[in-house]
Amino acid sequence: MSIFRTASTLALATALALAAGPAFSYSINNSRQIVDDSGKVVQLKGVNVFGFETGNHVMHGLWARNWKDMIVQMQGLGFNAVRLPFCPATLRSDTMPASIDYSRNADLQGLTSLQILDKVIAEFNARGMYVLLDHHTPDCAGISELWYTGSYTEAQWLADLRFVANRYKNVPYVLGLDLKNEPHGAATWGTGNAATDWNKAAERGSAAVLAVAPKWLIAVEGITDNPVCSTNGGIFWGGNLQPLACTPLNIPANRLLLAPHVYGPDVFVQSYFNDSNFPNNMPAIWERHFGQFAGTHALLLGEFGGKYGEGDARDKTWQDALVKYLRSKGINQGFYWSWNPNSGDTGGILRDDWTSVRQDKMTLLRTLWGTAGNTTPTPTPTPTPTPTPTPTPTPTPTPGTSTFSTKVIVDNSWNGGYCNRVQVTNTGTASGTWSIAVPVTGTVNNAWNATWSQSGSTLRASGVDFNRTLAAGATAEFGFCAAS
């Protein structure tokens, strides 16, 4: 599209400025793991953060919270990766966002949607959080069956993929692109029909992206029913990879990431959810739809989720069984749907106040990640005791202490106000609960990730649920805006 080829010098400079040193390279090793260019295995503890793919053209929730506040909270909960959906109109240089409370997000005032996308990606990158971009909808409204529609051509799709790849290829923590969200309906695989074969379109899309961003990963989803090489029925959009067994993808194996989607009864009640053997019937279904390829390809779920007990009662059972199955396949990562609470059929990690956390969902995800805590070890036999000399008593060590230092970072300033972030670090030798005071100018009118009060030129702040207690050496962060 011509609008992308006439991007202003300023926009290009902004894109290049996102890079913090040379870009990382991501690939798939022989053990089907994602690794960076140092050979370090990358585990994606991910969540979907949506909004840029909608008519708002910006991440949702900014009517209720500060955007950096949410990113800090994500990271504090243990997420280290996001899948970030977008739509073509968001990429246009003249598209403006909607539904932002600028009193909470003053640094976004006057920015286009693309400029905000740049800032959001740059913030994730600065925090060492991985980003998988996702071409989600062609019209910023509904999910299309194919990669093109009557008003959005394949040529436009390929141009958009190239544009995104070129813009973010040098941002170290952007690891790749999900070529098309949830092919379904008319989409086929391996039939020889060029108009509908998603596998061939994915190969063309991959070639377009890798020609521009050769260090990226390419995420490819499945389809739904297929006339060949597929047992059909009961498949969620993007969830059927069965035809891959008959028609492999001509995409470099060290760049290919299979990323099917799967959901439970909160999204749609498939017949197998009513089976008398549910949920014990599910592993065989998952194995058929996508799991059979976990032994030959890098595979994770690009979307999965649900209300987890606050909708259809079976959904919690389903999600628990899914995580158990994934762990059995050696899959300990993926992108949960969603961070946002305003996903009607799944809810989110956040509740409707855009702040409170579904701790039960986090417990589920930590089980998937393998960070839920150690299980009780199997007892070992008690050995026959042998006499030992009485040891010399050792002095009781002095308990550790916690002390806290602060670092104030200026985020934005303008005539009449400013926004700062404050990093609080436990410089002591034991964990502790932080409460600090920092000098301020003017009147604080908004703060996030802290309980706060102002007395004169002093801002007093203490942690909230997810960041209140810091281990020795750990850092929390909160922010505030003030009228000066």
Swiss-Prot record:
Residues 378-398 have a biased composition (Pro residues). Residues 395-484 form the CBM2 domain. The keyword Glycoprotein does not apply. It catalyses: Endohydrolysis of (1->4)-beta-D-glucosidic linkages in cellulose, lichenin and cereal beta-D-glucans. Residues 1-25 form the signal peptide. Residues 370-402 are annotated as: Disordered. One of its GO terms (molecular function) is cellulase activity. Disulfide bonds: none annotated. SUPFAM superfamilies: (Trans)glycosidases (SSF51445), Carbohydrate-binding domain (SSF49384). Residues 375-399 are annotated as: Thr-Pro repeats ('hinge') (Pro-Thr box). Its EC number is 3.2.1.4. It comes from the Bacteria. GO terms for biological process: cellulose catabolic process. The active site is at residues 182, 303. Keywords: Carbohydrate metabolism, Cellulose degradation, Glycosidase, Hydrolase, Polysaccharide degradation, Repeat, Signal. Pfam families: CBM_2 (PF00553), Cellulase (PF00150). The C-terminal region of the protein is not crucial for activity. Belongs to the glycosyl hydrolase 5 (cellulase A) family. This is Major extracellular endoglucanase. It comes from Xanthomonas campestris pv. campestris (strain ATCC 33913 / DSM 3586 / NCPPB 528 / LMG 568 / P 25).
